[in-house]
Amino acid sequence: MSELNKLPPYMQILFNKIYQNKILTALFDDERIVKLAHFGIKKKIMKDLLRDVAKNAHVLQIGLTFGDEIDCIYQKVKKLGKLDVFDVSALQLEYAKNKYERKNIELANYNAALPWDEKYDVVICYNLLHELPLQTRRQVMDNVLNSLAMGGKAIFVDYAKPVWWQLLRYPLFVFNRLYRPFCESLWQQPLENFSSKKDGFRWQHSYYGGKLWQKTIAVPKILSNEDVKKLTKLFRGK
């Protein structure tokens, strides 16, 4: 097995029972289960996500997802654009080949912690970052940002820190401690802080369900912060 095809250790330890199990994969792929796991707010998240994807966009998604999320992206770009998907699980990719066999979706067994050459108009990480160890998360986010074409954007949909009145805040805290050890870090700081490239991008945050979820968009800055300061001084005659 090549370096590109190896299943990362964190996947083998934490998620092997789900992502390497055909029966559980089929169960969790049921859209009703997916909507339940989104606490009833997936429709709003997807509506906003699709608004951020142009019909002629060349899109890359990092990681396969359960439910109809990838199909919704495909339906948006199928006539004028293109959709590629990376994943590290051979079983999930095999399942996806059958699931999307009639759709022109390019599936690749590739670890996004390693850089790639192709540039994209939109790169999506949907419900992925909370599964990644901090170093891997930084590598993936940096590679995503490096792969944006001119005028491109990166879209990260993931968990956030729920507001104090959100009834699910405390059950989720306990669940994360037990089963999702890397998720709690998303409660502790803005998502952009996990990337070493953050200063070269502008970040826009949207929240859903009392901050159960976030959609964070990164777009490259045309001018750096230092350039803006210099121009401001110039216009003010300083």
State the predicted function of each range:
Residues 6-48:
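Class I SAM-dependent methyltransferase Rossmann-like catalytic core
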Residues 37-56, 68, 72:
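Conserved alpha-helix/loop element of class I SAM-dependent methyltransferases that forms part
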Residues 60-113:
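Class I SAM-dependent methyltransferase SAM/SAH-binding core
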Residues 114-118:
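Short conserved loop adjoining the S-adenosyl-L-methionine
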Residues 124:
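A conserved beta-strand element that flanks and buttresses the S-adenosyl-L-methionine
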Residues 138-150:
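A short glycine-rich, Lys/Arg-flanked "PGG" loop and its adjoining helix->strand segment in the class I
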Residues 156-198, 203-213:
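C-terminal alpha-helical "lid/dimerization" subdomain adjacent to the S-adenosyl-L-methionine
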Residues 199-238:
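Core SAM-dependent methyltransferase catalytic element
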